[in-house]
Amino acid sequence: RMAFNIVARNQDDHVKNIAFLMDKTGSWSLSPAFDMTYSYNPTGRWTGTHQMSLNGKRDDFTIDDFTACEKAIAMQRGRGLEIMQEVQDAVTQWPAFAAEAGVPAETADQITLVHRTGI
């Protein structure tokens, strides 16, 4: 979710948009994703920057930030980069998804311009 929020510019990525579920045995799991949508306005009070940080940063992310996160949470080496590539591959398909959903071409193009698919 973090990678998607950064690449697709969901800058409304605050803690109330991440939840957990507990099953009948008391085991916890991450809830299905929700409120994950494009929300970027460079002059907006809440959407001008990410609400959550990655490697102490809220903008100008690099692949090194994802690698640092991978290490910090003891993720299998290289898995963070795999996730990042999967997310970037999915987000580059945005124009096709937007067209299928009937998003006006001008709007879809404006959103495409600010996606971070080159990290």
Protein language model regions, located:
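Anionic ligand-binding catalytic core segments
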Residues: 1-119
